[in-house]
């Protein structure tokens, strides 16, 4: 009898929760329509996987890519609409959030073609891979629009859990297992520190969780200059620092980059930084409005350490993926300059513009690593010597992406860095910009060293990997080459058309 009553209560409670969720989705679903498209794509993938065989593999790629493209289209149609706060204050829709969501969707859309041939060659489970990618994308999008401390904590956990699973997707590889273990342990530790910081904000503001209400609560309780806010600032900086991976929170980055499947690294290297940057700008600019000097100082220290350590250690690397890992640490130092500058001197606009270029430069480079690795099975920088003699397209596209990463004119990376540094200079960050300029010169050295290897024609320097290099038929190779072509064009052409891109980015004030 007691069990029967408990069962009825459970059913009633479950029904109430379901009806409440349905009510929220019915009346607020239009505000998260791009996210709903991805959710529908996830459900469709699961349904097709459970009712079909492996011969329907092309459908999996088609559904995933179509969901992402439709979500991008929905975002573009919603551009310029008035800012809206929905789901009882948990989610905010505005141009600033949407442009970061667009960047995340763009990353995912370009990463799926990179994965096609890799999945076929390594015989990985395709459905789970695409499910994790779409779910991580969904988590990143929710993080960009999060408007309260709980959502800001839960959304990156959705992204992080999928990232852990993706990094350990090749279970038979010892390096992949090691990367997953380190990633999981450090990710769990950083999440606990992050939520500890949120708890201090919650208590100091009198029990508020919405970002703007936290500010109002701190004013009402007169706690905006209390030691608790300093503890919250340090804890949240450490938690977000793990997602952005600036020095000294970068220890996981080289090992995860080296041990994870290359398409996964390409995905994580850009999406995690875009989502974390969107979250960092809102958290530091709103709840810590009264502590701007303190968080500016913290971020300046992180930026200096990242630019110096990232670029100097990258010189000594022999693995291509580890080199890009340290390079990404240096690159995030440049992005932090834009976060520090803020809206006052177009800091956010320059940061968004540079991140758009960074996506194309980085993914183009990883496309080359995927293609070369599948042909040769090596990731050693030395083994790329003489690639131009066997595959001129791959070598030239790689050279363009690397030169753009280094910031050489007239490529997009040069103009992106130029505007970013100019905004920092106007804001009075002279020392920070000087460090950025010097470390950019250092980065050009190790990028040019790789390009020199690619273009060498001396037989004594060409390794057996390149001598035995064979291009696959165009049919099996076109997805990687398509992504690479798009990335190369995006990393070169926009350099001569910066003004329209900057104008769009300047409209993203929140």
Curated annotation (Swiss-Prot):
Pfam families: Ndh2_N, Proton_antipo_M. Its EC number is 7.1.1.-. Keywords: Chloroplast, Membrane, NAD, NADP, Plastid, Plastoquinone, Quinone, Thylakoid, Translocase, Transmembrane, Transmembrane helix, Transport. GO terms for biological process: ATP synthesis coupled electron transport; photosynthesis, light reaction. The chain crosses the membrane at residues 24-44, 59-79, 99-119, 124-144, 149-169, 183-203, 229-249, 295-315, 323-343, 347-367, 395-415, 418-438, 484-504. It is a multi-pass membrane protein. The keyword Zinc-finger does not apply. It catalyses: a plastoquinone + NADH + (n+1) H(+)(in) = a plastoquinol + NAD(+) + n H(+)(out); a plastoquinone + NADPH + (n+1) H(+)(in) = a plastoquinol + NADP(+) + n H(+)(out). Its main location: plastid. GO terms for cellular component: chloroplast thylakoid membrane. It is found in: Plastid, Chloroplast thylakoid membrane. The keyword DNA-binding does not apply. One of its GO terms (molecular function) is quinone binding. NDH is composed of at least 16 different subunits, 5 of which are encoded in the nucleus. HAMAP family: NDH1_NuoN_1 (MF_00445). NDH shuttles electrons from NAD(P)H:plastoquinone, via FMN and iron-sulfur (Fe-S) centers, to quinones in the photosynthetic chain and possibly in a chloroplast respiratory chain. The immediate electron acceptor for the enzyme in this species is believed to be plastoquinone. Couples the redox reaction to proton translocation, and thus conserves the redox energy in a proton gradient. Belongs to the complex I subunit 2 family. This is NAD(P)H-quinone oxidoreductase subunit 2, chloroplastic. It comes from Narcissus elegans.
């Amino acid at each position: 009898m007691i069990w029967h009553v408990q069962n009825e209560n459970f059913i009633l409670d479950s029904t109430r929760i379901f009806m409440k969720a349905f009510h929220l989705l019915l009346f607020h679903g239009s505000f998260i329509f791009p996210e709903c498209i991805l959710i529908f794509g996830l459900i469709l993938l699961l349904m097709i996987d459970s009712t079909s065989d492996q011969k329907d593999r092309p459908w999996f790629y088609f559904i995933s890519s179509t969901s992402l493209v439709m979500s991008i289209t929905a975002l573009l149609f919603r551009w310029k609409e008035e800012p809206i706060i929905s789901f009882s204050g948990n989610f905010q829709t505005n141009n600033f959030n949407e442009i970061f969501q667009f960047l995340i969707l763009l990353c995912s859309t370009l990463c799926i073609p990179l994965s096609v041939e890799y999945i076929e060659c390594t015989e990985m489970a395709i459905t789970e891979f695409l499910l994790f990618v779409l779910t991580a994308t969904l988590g990143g999008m929710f993080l960009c629009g999060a408007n309260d401390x709980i959502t800001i904590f839960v959304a990156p956990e959705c992204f992080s859990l999928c990232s852990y699973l993706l990094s350990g997707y090749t279970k038979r590889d010892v390096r992949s297992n090691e990367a997953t273990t380190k990633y999981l342990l450090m990710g769990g530790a950083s999440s606990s520190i992050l939520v500890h910081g949120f708890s201090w904000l919650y208590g100091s503001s009198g029990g508020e969780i919405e970002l703007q209400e936290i500010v109002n609560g701190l004013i009402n309780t007169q706690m905006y200059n209390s030691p608790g806010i300093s503890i919250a600032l340090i804890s949240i900086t450490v938690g977000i620092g793990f997602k952005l991976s600036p020095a000294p929170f970068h220890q996981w980055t080289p090992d995860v980059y080296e041990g994870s499947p290359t398409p996964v690294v390409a995905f994580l290297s850009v999406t995690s930084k875009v989502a974390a940057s969107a979250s960092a700008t809102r958290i530091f600019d709103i709840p810590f409005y009264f502590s701007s000097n303190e968080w500016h100082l913290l971020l300046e220290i992180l930026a200096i350490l990242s630019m110096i350590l990232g670029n100097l250690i990258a010189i000594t690397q022999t693995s291509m993926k580890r080199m890009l890992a340290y390079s990404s640490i240096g690159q995030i130092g440049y992005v932090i300059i834009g976060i520090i500058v803020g809206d006052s001197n177009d800091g956010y606009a320059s940061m968004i513009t540079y991140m758009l270029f960074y996506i194309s430069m980085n993914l183009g480079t990883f496309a080359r690593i995927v293609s070369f690795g599948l042909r040769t099975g090596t990731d050693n920088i030395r083994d790329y010597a003489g690639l131009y003699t066997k595959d001129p397209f791959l070598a030239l596209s790689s050279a363009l992406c690397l030169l753009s990463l280094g910031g050489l004119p007239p490529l997009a990376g040069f103009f992106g860095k130029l505007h970013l540094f100019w905004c920092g200079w106007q804001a009075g960050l002279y020392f920070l910009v000087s460090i950025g300029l010097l470390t950019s010169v250092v980065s050009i050295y190790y990028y040019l060293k790789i390009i020199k290897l690619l273009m060498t024609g001396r037989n004594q320097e060409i390794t057996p990997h390149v001598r035995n290099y064979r291009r696959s038929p165009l049919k099996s190779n076109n997805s990687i080459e398509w992504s690479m072509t798009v990335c190369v064009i995006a990393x070169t052409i926009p350099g001569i058309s910066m003004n329209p891109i900057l104008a769009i980015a300047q409209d993203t004030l929140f």
